[in-house]
Amino acid sequence: MAVFPIINLENINDDGRAKILEQIEDACQNWGFFELVNHGIPHEFLDMVEKMTRDHYKKCMEERFKETVLSKGLEAAQAEVNDMDWESTFFLRHLPESNISQMSDLDEEYKKIMKEFAKKLENLAEELLDLLCENLGLEKGYLKKAFYGSKGPTFGTKVSNYPPCPKPDLIKGLRAHTDAGGIILLFQDDKVSGLQLLKDGNWIDVPPMRHAIVVNLGDQLEVITNGRYKSVMHRVLTQTSGTGRMSIASFYNPGSDAVIYPAPALVEKDQDEEKKEVYPKFVFEDYMKLYLGVKFQAKEPRFEAMKANANLGPMATA
């Protein structure tokens, strides 16, 4: 059975670089996911982020979740719930403009820590994008530039808690989907599992590891790499007991008006004429408008819809 890729970045700047790049390439081509250790973010800092996130949930969100329609309604449910997720979340925007100062129920120390956390994750995301460029034979900075709209990239963090669920067979913590954006960095619970990815028709656990950062690729990297790398379906299962699962996912995405298309250098290398036409050219915001309505469906029809829209020309979008 294939082993989930865990990549140690400790020697990325010395004689271990070639091996690490090879591991990243294999993970991007065959998994769409990997887990990073020795990524440069101090363990003590991650411990602080985790503690403050858990404290905030208990103080501000736990009781609120128990009072939701979903929480109360599940008690009477007899059939599988397919239109909602068993999660308690809030979202922080970082780029192009931060909304952290406007989050009234976050205390000042938590705001400060999350701003610092976001900057560290932003730097790590950009470092990873350049490692992908190196593997792809693209110039350094190509992927970062590809994500730039008129205001730069979009970067935000989804903070999630998955409370214990009384009927885990009837509802998912988060339904199966691929991520729409670019590269996603996840700081997840190291004690409670639940995140799974779909590989070769089987659901495989993403192992909880203390102080690790899970990385997965979004739809936009599949397009830009002309299918060499793939976004992968993943989901979160619910748990019946324990303290619940914490998840902090940071999404480094294209700017809303960024124009996304396969890198010409990667298309030129592809001798298969049919494959050259698989991925469309589109504005990221247009893709997101489509994605929001069909997030929990297969990605391929989204690509086909964007390609059809592009082929119809300007009149179709007027």
Swiss-Prot record:
Pathway: Alkene biosynthesis; ethylene biosynthesis via S-adenosyl-L-methionine; ethylene from S-adenosyl-L-methionine: step 2/2
Binding annotation for Fe cation: 177, 179, 234
Domain Fe2OG dioxygenase per the UniProt entry, residue ranges: 153-254
Superkingdom of the organism of origin: Eukaryota
Record flagged with keyword Ion transport: no
One Pfam family, short name: DIOX_N
EC number(s) stated in the UniProt entry for this protein: 1.14.17.4
Keyword Amino-acid biosynthesis: no
Classification via Gene3D superfamilies: B-lactam Antibiotic, Isopenicillin N Synthase, Chain
Gene Ontology terms for molecular function: 1-aminocyclopropane-1-carboxylate oxidase activity; L-ascorbic acid binding; metal ion binding
UniProt tissue specificity: Fruit.
Catalytic activity reported: 1-aminocyclopropane-1-carboxylate + L-ascorbate + O2 = ethene + L-dehydroascorbate + hydrogen cyanide + CO2 + 2 H2O
Cofactor: Fe cation
Alphabetical list of InterPro entries matching this protein: DIOX_N, IPNS-like_FE2OG_OXY, IPNS-like_sf, Oxoglu/Fe-dep_dioxygenase_dom, Plant_2OG-oxidoreductases
Residue runs in coiled coils: none
Keywords: Ethylene biosynthesis, Fruit ripening, Iron, Metal-binding, Oxidoreductase, Vitamin C
GO BP term (any one): ethylene biosynthetic process
Similarity section: Belongs to the iron/ascorbate-dependent oxidoreductase family.
Protein name, as recorded: 1-aminocyclopropane-1-carboxylate oxidase 1
Source species of the chain: Cucumis melo (Muskmelon)
